[in-house]
Amino acid sequence: MDKLVIRGGKQICGTIPASGSKNSALPIIAATLLTPDGTFAIDRTPDLKDVRTFIQLLNYLGAETSFENNLLKVSTGQLKSIEAPYELVKKMRASIYVLGPLLARFGHTRVSLPGGCAFGPRPVDLHIMVMEKLGATVTIEKGFINARVNGSRLRGTHIDFPISSVGATGNALMASVMAKGTTILDNAALEPEIECLCNFLVKMGAKIDGIGTTTLVIDGVDQLKAVEFENIFDRIEAGTLLCAAAITGGSVTVTSVAPEQLASVLDAFRQSGCTVTTNGNSVTLTAPAELNPVDITARPYPEFPTDMQAQWMALMTQARGDSTIIDRIYLERFNHIPELNRLGAHIEIRDNWALVHGPQELTGTKVMSTDLRASACLVLAGLVAKDTTEVLRVYHLDRGYEAIEKKLTALGADIRREKYQEFS
């Protein structure tokens, strides 16, 4: 197993480009299953564990793929299976994205219930509701979702999501683009990753109106085609790198971004006393002499993202005063708190919110990652902690950050990856 060894106390300074977004790449890769026509070329695909797992899943289904220098090529003309097996799906919850496109293309599919980060309930009920609304019969048997179209193809319908869901919106889009008639999605997710998926599907030949709003109108088409496409940037990675500068008293410019997609995070940084400027496709953050405490509540886009909640908590351990952190999306996403407290933080969990007492001097020790963003949180804490911090189980980190230790090293961090043996 790998661990990251961090000697804290180094300022994070310099210029670094943002990687492509994992959260948009995965549904885009799934959408290639919609058509046998041609070869897709998806640029700016991040080289991550989750992406590699998804490529493995496509290969299992019979797709031909090549992946080099962040360019992914996919051809799904000769698929040999419509079943997504447990052995691959268990590794990440995003595997559920194959449900919609396989059902739309073949009329039936069998997908194992997904895995991924272990925090709080993440039911597949909304995905099943979407497929049933579109005219499929869905059952769950022996850990598999079995879905079959009643008739020759899915049928357009009106779907009003009870809550905003990125995953269910993505699956609804992919399932409905070739459905007969018109589908209306109300309370659709607003996240940039959904807008990116819409743009990808439109380039393939789909007809989607209302892109960038909570109401999407999809007129089904008979066929789609393979295309070339460039993925968007990873706004969570960008926010994490900005946090690294803020927590260490440094200054960083992150390039190849769309600053407007970071608006809520940049506003929070400004409230904390950081100087934040944008210039075209770049964001520059310079840390203040003292950080102000800033309360945040994680909600669906365009509000503060749940995927930045843990990193913000690490930052607030260094603020001069107390701050509160609430997560309205995943109420139990606080697995990082005990590990932060091991480093010397003083954080209390009160019902479904956390109270961070700052500032606290952190001291390096061994800490264990429990999920993707908790891993990033602990790395940030290690950057400012005295002495040496060892972050164990960084396979979680590798699911969503592309060579993060190399990027941080380029910005001045003393961080290295080492092998270790974990006792059972």
UniProtKB/Swiss-Prot annotation:
Residues at which phosphoenolpyruvate binds: 22-23
Matches recorded under InterPro entries: Enolpyruvate_Tfrase_dom, Enolpyruvate_Tfrase_sf, MurA_subfamily, RNA3'P_cycl/enolpyr_Trfase_a/b, UDP_GlcNAc_COvinyl_MurA
Record-linked Pfam families: EPSP_synthase
Keyword Isomerase: no
Catalytic activity: phosphoenolpyruvate + UDP-N-acetyl-alpha-D-glucosamine = UDP-N-acetyl-3-O-(1-carboxyvinyl)-alpha-D-glucosamine + phosphate
Residues annotated to bind UDP-N-acetyl-alpha-D-glucosamine: 93, 122-126, 307, 329
Entry EC number(s): 2.5.1.7
Pathway note: Cell wall biogenesis; peptidoglycan biosynthesis
In-chain residues carrying the UniProt-annotated modification 2-(S-cysteinyl)pyruvic acid O-phosphothioketal: 117
One Gene Ontology term from the biological process aspect of the record: UDP-N-acetylgalactosamine biosynthetic process
GO-annotated molecular function: UDP-N-acetylglucosamine 1-carboxyvinyltransferase activity
GO CC, alphabetical: cytoplasm
Protein keywords: Cell cycle, Cell division, Cell shape, Cell wall biogenesis/degradation, Cytoplasm, Peptidoglycan synthesis, Pyruvate, Transferase
Keyword Zinc: no
Described function: Cell wall formation. Adds enolpyruvyl to UDP-N-acetylglucosamine.
Family stated for the protein in its record: Belongs to the EPSP synthase family. MurA subfamily.
The protein, known as: UDP-N-acetylglucosamine 1-carboxyvinyltransferase
Gene: murA
